[in-house]
Design a protein with these regions (language model features):
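Rossmann-like adenosine-cofactor binding region
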Residues: 209-291
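Adenosine-phosphate binding glycine-rich loop
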Residues: 118-144, 148-159, 269, 274-363
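Glycine/serine-rich phosphate-binding loop and adjoining beta1-alpha1 elements at the start
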Residues: 2, 8, 79-169, 298-300
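Short glycine-/small-residue-rich Rossmann-like dinucleotide-binding loops
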Residues: 69, 75-76, 95-96, 221, ...
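An N-terminal-biased, well-structured beta-alpha scaffold segment characteristic
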Residues: 2-110
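Glycine-rich phosphate/diphosphate-binding loop of Rossmann-like nucleotide-binding domains
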Residues: 6-45, 152-240, 287
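Residue-level detector of alpha-helix initiation sites
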Residues: 76, 136, 177-178
Length: 363
C-alpha cells in the first residue's frame, strides 16, 4: 500500500503521525511510505532519518494526498485540506466529527473512508488510540491551569500547591476517566486540594483506592458541582462520551458562583466542550474570559509537547496502521470489530451512530 504522511498544519500542532521507526516497519513489509518535507522536524525527526529507513520525501502536502492510498495524520484535516482528500482514500486520524459539521460534510462529499482514532476499541471496550493522548492532555491540563492561575497570566496569583502555613489551591476535576485521573494525580502531586467527580460509583470506588490522601471523590450531579464552585480555583473538564458531543456540566449562570480569576480548562473541547461558555482556542491564543472567569480551551493540548506525545501516540497507532496497510481497511475491519468501530464515514455515508445523532441525521 502507498502510505502518505502530511505535515500537520493546525495551529501549533507539532506532532507527526509516523516516526522513522514506524516508517521502517511499513517499508520492511513492502509498503511505500511518502513523508511531506519537514513533517517530523518539530518532533525531532529530520527528513534524512526517514530517508535512511526507506521512506521517500515529497515537497508539498498536495503531492502527499495525490499519491497516497492511506493518509495517516494526527489531527483532522482542516479547511485547506478538504479538497485534497480523494474518493475511496483511507484517512486514519483523530476526527472528532460530532462537534464539527463542516468537517463532517466535507469528508462525506470527498467519498473517502474516515477511520477515527478516537472510536477504535480494544477487546475490553477501551479506547486504545485515545488513551495515550488522554494521559498527556490530563497531565498538561493541570500544568496549564496552574500557569494561568499566576498573576502575570491574568489569574488570581495562586500557587497550586501552596506552602507551609498557606492553603493550597482547590482543584475540581469533572470526569474520572483517563484524562481526569491523570489531571487529578498531577494536581495532587503538586500539593493541591483535589476533588474528582464522576457519575459511576464503581469508578469512584476504584479512584478512592489508589488516589493520594489529598484527592477526594464526589458523585457528579449539578447540585454537587454547584456546591464546589464558590471555593474552587481550577476546574478541569474531562468528560467523554466516545464519538459523541460532550454534555455541558457547567452552564453560564454557574460562572456567577465562582471567584473572579477562576480557571476553567476544557479538555473535552475537541468533542464540543463540557462548559457552555467554551469555544476552541489555540496555543497561540489559549485563553479568554467570560464574566471574569478564565477559559483555556486548546483543542490540541498534546501538540505543545511533541517529543513526548508523538512517541506516545505512534506507539499505539502503529500496529493498527500496519494492519490496515497489510490487509486493506475492509479486511482489517472484518477481522477485528474494534477496528470496525473506528469507521465513522465510508464512501460518503456516516456509519457511526453518535456522529449522526449529533446532527440529528439518520444512518
Amino acid at each position: 500500500m502507498i502510505v502518505g504522511i502530511p505535515k500537520e498544519i493546525k495551529n501549533n500542532e507539532n506532532r507527526v503521525s509516523l516516526t522513522p521507526a514506524g516508517a521502517h516497519e511499513l517499508v520492511q513489509r513492502g509498503h511505500t511510505v511518502y513523508i511531506q518535507h519537514t513533517a517530523g522536524i518539530n518532533s525531532g525527526f529530520s527528513d534524512e532519518e526517514y530517508e535512511k529507513v526507506g521512506a521517500r520525501i515529497l515537497p508539498t502536502i498536495e503531492d502527499v494526498y495525490a499519491i497516497a492510498e492511506m493518509i495517516i495524520k494526527v489531527k483532522e484535516p482542516i479547511e485547506c485540506e478538504y479538497n485534497l482528500v480523494r474518493k475511496s482514500q483511507l484517512v486514519f486520524t483523530y476526527f472528532h466529527f460530532a462537534c464539527d459539521k463542516e468537517l463532517t460534510e466535507a469528508m462525506m462529499r470527498s467519498g473517502s473512508v474516515c477511520l477515527a482514532y478516537e472510536t477504535v476499541t480494544d477487546k475490553q471496550g477501551g479506547l486504545p488510540l485515545l488513551i495515550p493522548m488522554s494521559e498527556v492532555a490530563g497531565r498538561m491540563s493541570t500544568q496549564e491551569g496552574a500557569r494561568f492561575l499566576e498573576k502575570p497570566q491574568g489569574g488570581r496569583g495562586i500557587l497550586l500547591g501552596g506552602v507551609p502555613g498557606v492553603k493550597p489551591a482547590k482543584v475540581l476535576v469533572l470526569g474520572g476517566g483517563i484524562v481526569g485521573t491523570n489531571a487529578a494525580l498531577m494536581a495532587a502531586g503538586l500539593g493541591a486540594d483535589v476533588t474528582i467527580c464522576d457519575i459511576s460509583l464503581p469508578r469512584l470506588r476504584q479512584l478512592s483506592e489508589f488516589m493520594p490522601k489529598n484527592v477526594k471523590t464526589l458523585f457528579s450531579s449539578s447540585h454537587n458541582i454547584e456546591k464546589e464552585l464558590p471555593t474552587t480555583d481550577l476546574i478541569i473538564g474531562a468528560v467523554l462520551i466516545p464519538g459523541a458531543k460532550a454534555p455541558h456540566l457547567i452552564t453560564r449562570p454557574m460562572l456567577k458562583l465562582m471567584k473572579k480569576g477562576t480557571v476553567l480548562v476544557d479538555v473535552a473541547i475537541d468533542q464540543g466542550g463540557c462548559f457552555e461558555t467554551s469555544h476552541p482556542t489555540t496555543h497561540a491564543e489559549p485563553i479568554y474570559e467570560v464574566d471574569g472567569i478564565i477559559h483555556y480551551c486548546v483543542a490540541n493540548i498534546p501538540g505543545a509537547v511533541p517529543c513526548t506525545s508523538t512517541l506516545a501516540l505512534t506507539n499505539a497507532t502503529l500496529p493498527y496502521a500496519i494492519r490496515l496497510a497489510d490487509l486493506g481497511w475492509e479486511k482489517a475491519c472484518e477481522n477485528d470489530p474494534g477496528v470496525k468501530n473506528g469507521l465513522n464515514i465510508v464512501n460518503g455515508k456516516i456509519v457511526f451512530p453518535a456522529v449522526a445523532e449529533a446532527f440529528g441525521w439518520k444512518i
